[in-house]
């Protein structure tokens, strides 16, 4: 058996190695861990937790009963890890601040992600002056959307109400067309949870399709 006596007396590590060891030791001192590293991890965990909570509620409202439980599973695991870290350090205010700021920022980030996902269908009600809604009806039919037109009476005379069920990610394009071709039209948009049937059957959407299209969409140059 060979015995390694180690470095000879008077041996010194290279300066670069000494510096790396010093930085590593500094990063893992108790004060750095308790007041910076662990609070940052709790902050990030809380952002992820609240984002998942927001998306889970959205998926439940859209009737996605298989995807919502999967998100709930990971959501509760992350929440338990974060809350255990806070409860084990009740005397450290950094943990409370990290948890609170993570909750606030996670709410905002979750709403932004939900908006980018553009999940599900919406119902559009468009009210135009009598005879001026034919262009909107033709446009919706060209986009493979069914329309229901009703003659009604408004405060200033006859109007036409156009009702159509459209994909949520198509709403910006449709509203832009309405504002350009019929700026005087009034329209409202409501979420729809379930669709049974119609003239044009809606296609099943991948919940991440809208988000991917948003990322891939070319941005305008200033």
From Swiss-Prot:
InterPro entries found in the cross-reference section: DUF2179, DUF5698, UPF0316
Subcellular location: Cell membrane
Protein name: UPF0316 protein Mboo_0791
Major subcellular location class: membrane
Pfam families noted in UniProt: DUF2179 (PF10035), DUF5698 (PF18955)
CDD domains reported in the protein's UniProt record: YitT_C_like_1
The keyword Cell membrane is annotated on this UniProt entry: yes
Record field: transmembrane: 25-45, 67-87, 93-113
GO cellular component: plasma membrane
The keyword DNA damage appears for this protein: no
Membrane topology: Multi-pass membrane protein
